[in-house]
Structures are given as C-alpha cells and as structure tokens.
C-alpha cells in the first residue's frame, strides 16, 4: 500500500448542507425547519422543562425543588436506650459501637439521641449529642465527651495552590 492509495472511510467526509438555496436543493425556503413556529426561529428555543404554557411537571411536584447541600454532614444515630445493657467499665466510643453493631459505617460521625432511659453511669464519646441525651447521660452520673469530626473540603478555586503563594514571591 502506498500513500496515494489511502482513502478516508466511507461516509467520513460529508458535504456541508447548503440551506436556503432554492426548493430544487431540497433545503430551500424553510431550510429543513418545517413551518412557522417557535422551533423554526433562530436562538436557543424554550427552556428544557417548558410545556407550552401548561403548568410544568417541575412545578407540579414540589418535592423536586431546591438544591442538594454538598457540605451537609450525615450522622450515624444511636439512642441512649440502646446503651442500657452496656458494661459500665467499657467506654462508649464510635469504635466500640461499631464492634457491637450499633452503628454500621465507620466513616460517618456518631450522634447520640435521647430516646429511652439510661440508668448506669457511662463515659460516652461521640461527635454530637442532642440536648436530651446529654441531660440523661449526666443525670445517670456519666460523662458526654465531644469528639471532633474533620471534613476534608477541597477548594473550589481552580487557581494556583494557596500553599505555594509565599513560595512564588521571590
């Protein structure tokens, strides 16, 4: 095979459509746009959810509105009532809760809620406590210790790395 034998694939080079060059061309007058109307006009056309003036589906379904907060933190929830049989000498931590299968996911922060009764004094370490849970824990003679939960948030800036800012000023 030589260089002059090479040919593009069949149908790879398509001729440009010449619109509005008389009805003999097949694309004269309306240029393939059909008769008059909103879709025949130039420009971007109606918005995606437009239904011709009828109340659109997005508006008819109120639960589909709003936005999703990407910074929202979801918690693994444990009620105080589920800690009734907990041994007094064992601290309640996210790791021990995971080992006893009271929480499912390791990578989520733990919140203690105040549903149920607590009788024994427990030392509970969690990332968040409801007011009623904290009150019940302290009323039973235990301690509610807050743990910090660090969320790694990436910068939305596409500019230079902020940590390199001082390095470039030489």
Curated annotation (Swiss-Prot):
InterPro entries registered for this protein in UniProt: Ribosomal_uL15, Ribosomal_uL15/eL18, Ribosomal_uL15/eL18_sf, Ribosomal_uL15_bac-type, Ribosomal_uL15_CS
Pfam families: Ribosomal_L27A
GO BP annotations listed: translation
GO cellular component entries: cytosolic large ribosomal subunit
GO MF annotations, alphabetized: rRNA binding; structural constituent of ribosome
Compositional bias ranges of the Basic and acidic residues kind: 1-12
Record key words, sorted: Ribonucleoprotein, Ribosomal protein, RNA-binding, rRNA-binding
Biased amino acid composition, Basic residues: 13-26
Positions of region (Disordered): 1-52
Subunit relationships: Part of the 50S ribosomal subunit.
Protein family membership: Belongs to the universal ribosomal protein uL15 family.
Biological role: Binds to the 23S rRNA.
Stored NCBIfam families: rplO_bact
Protein name: Large ribosomal subunit protein uL15
Species, as recorded: Chloroflexus aurantiacus (strain ATCC 29366 / DSM 635 / J-10-fl)
């Amino acid at each position: 095979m030589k260089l002059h034998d090479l040919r593009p694939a069949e149908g790879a080079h398509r001729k440009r459509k010449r619109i509005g060059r008389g009805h003999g061309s097949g694309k004269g007058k309306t240029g393939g746009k059909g008769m008059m109307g909103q879709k025949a006009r130039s420009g971007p056309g109606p918005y995606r959810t437009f239904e011709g003036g009828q109340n659109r589906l997005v508006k008819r379904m109120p639960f589909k509105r709003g936005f999703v907060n990407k910074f929202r933190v979801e918690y693994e929830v444990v009620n105080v009532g589920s800690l009734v049989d907990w041994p007094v000498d064992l601290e309640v931590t996210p790791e021990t809760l995971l080992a006893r299968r009271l929480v499912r996911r390791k990578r989520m922060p733990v919140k203690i809620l105040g549903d149920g009764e607590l009788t024994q004094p427990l030392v509970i370490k969690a990332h968040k406590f409801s007011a009623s849970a904290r009150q019940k824990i302290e009323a039973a003679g235990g301690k509610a210790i807050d743990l910090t939960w660090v969320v790694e948030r990436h910068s939305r800036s596409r500019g230079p790395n902020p940590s390199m800012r001082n390095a470039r000023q030489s």
